[in-house]
């Protein structure tokens, strides 16, 4: 799947789940389950409850996503 097909949205971490999964509330009010992207995992980027993040989602399943950036 090409990168252009992905939907990027801003959100806030609501809670931390097992296996580096997170529940994220998007700016439009929807709540999705997201995991950390490989580059963030490799560089040991820490994500805590309340952090602002950018989530990348596929148009095929809008209930799951990938966290690609943590805002300061």
From Swiss-Prot:
Matches recorded under InterPro entries: NA-bd_OB-fold, RNA-binding_domain_S1_IF1, S1_domain, TIF_IF1
Keywords on record: Cytoplasm, Initiation factor, Protein biosynthesis, RNA-binding, rRNA-binding
Source superkingdom: Bacteria
Entry's localization field: Cytoplasm
GO CC entries: cytosol
One function term, GO molecular function aspect: ribosome binding
Pfam annotation, one family: eIF-1a
Domain (S1-like): residue spans on this chain: 2-72
Function: One of the essential components for the initiation of protein synthesis. Stabilizes the binding of IF-2 and IF-3 on the 30S subunit to which N-formylmethionyl-tRNA(fMet) subsequently binds. Helps modulate mRNA selection, yielding the 30S pre-initiation complex (PIC). Upon addition of the 50S ribosomal subunit IF-1, IF-2 and IF-3 are released leaving the mature 70S translation initiation complex.
Assembly description: Component of the 30S ribosomal translation pre-initiation complex which assembles on the 30S ribosome in the order IF-2 and IF-3, IF-1 and N-formylmethionyl-tRNA(fMet); mRNA recruitment can occur at any time during PIC assembly.
Similarity comment: Belongs to the IF-1 family.
Protein name, as recorded: Translation initiation factor IF-1
